[in-house]
């Protein structure tokens, strides 16, 4: 982790130098070329888009009886190990799903013999495309490195596939932060599989489901620091 922490320290110093530079910007008068008609057309397109999303969201929620997981709460406790550098990765997470939309929060903790590094990753909005038994998604959010007071924009792409009476789930995902002067803070490729082994009735048809999981994670920091983890843990779902 020493290389990652060193690069983050450089990022922090660049941020402080930039904020202390006192750069001023001159005023300029920019004439707008947008006409009333083009603005009206833009609002019309936006309105149609909103109507389409509302319609598809309604259709997705109507399928809840056949696919109850479309409105659900997920949690995960998992850990990974990278043998080459004796590094341990913890990534507990929680996610709420409501039709086409999800929000996900996770904490990531890296620990080796010399140091530890925490990040808080929040995918504020994930947009789901449910094509049962496949669900594709894309998300937008940020990752925060509290010890260095740094925050990066982060996006995600991925997909989930359910089979064997929807008890077996595979998921692949990609996450990446914005490009800064030092390159991308982090890129991540993750693949996991889990199988529901038991469930407990909570209320009416809602059940609390327990699924052991295994997986693999590849992470690259600042375009040059590679890490590979074998994962194990437990996923929890409520629907």
Residue ranges and their predicted role:
Residues 1-66:
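Cleavable N-terminal export/targeting peptides
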Residues 73-79, 103-105, 136-140, 157, ...:
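Membrane-embedded beta-strand positions of outer-membrane beta-barrel proteins
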């Amino acid at each position: 982790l020493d290389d990652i922490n060193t690069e983050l320290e450089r990022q922090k110093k660049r941020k402080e130098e930039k904020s202390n530079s006192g750069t001023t910007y001159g005023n300029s008068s920019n004439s707008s070329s947008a006409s009333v008609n083009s603005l009206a057309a833009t609002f019309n397109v936006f309105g149609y888009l909103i109507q389409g999303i509302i319609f598809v969201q309604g259709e997705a929620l109507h399928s809840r009886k056949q696919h109850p997981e479309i409105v659900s709460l997920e949690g995960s406790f998992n850990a990974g190990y990278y043998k080459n550098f004796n590094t341990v990765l913890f990534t507990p997470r929680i996610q709420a799903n409501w039709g086409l939309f999800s929000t996900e929060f996770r904490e990531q903790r890296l620990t080796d013999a010399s140091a530890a590094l925490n990040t808080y990753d929040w995918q504020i909005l994930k947009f789901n495309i449910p094509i049962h038994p496949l669900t594709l998604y894309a998300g937008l959010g940020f990752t925060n490195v509290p010890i260095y007071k740094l925050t990066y924009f982060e996006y995600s792409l991925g997909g989930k596939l359910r089979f064997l009476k929807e008890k077996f789930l595979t998921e692949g995902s990609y996450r990446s932060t914005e490009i800064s002067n030092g390159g991308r803070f982090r890129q991540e490729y993750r693949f996991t599989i889990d199988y529901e082994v038991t469930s407990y009735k909570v209320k009416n048809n809602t059940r609390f489901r327990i699924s052991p999981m295994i997986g693999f994670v590849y992470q690259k920091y600042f375009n040059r620091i590679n890490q590979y983890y074998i994962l194990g843990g437990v996923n929890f779902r409520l629907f």
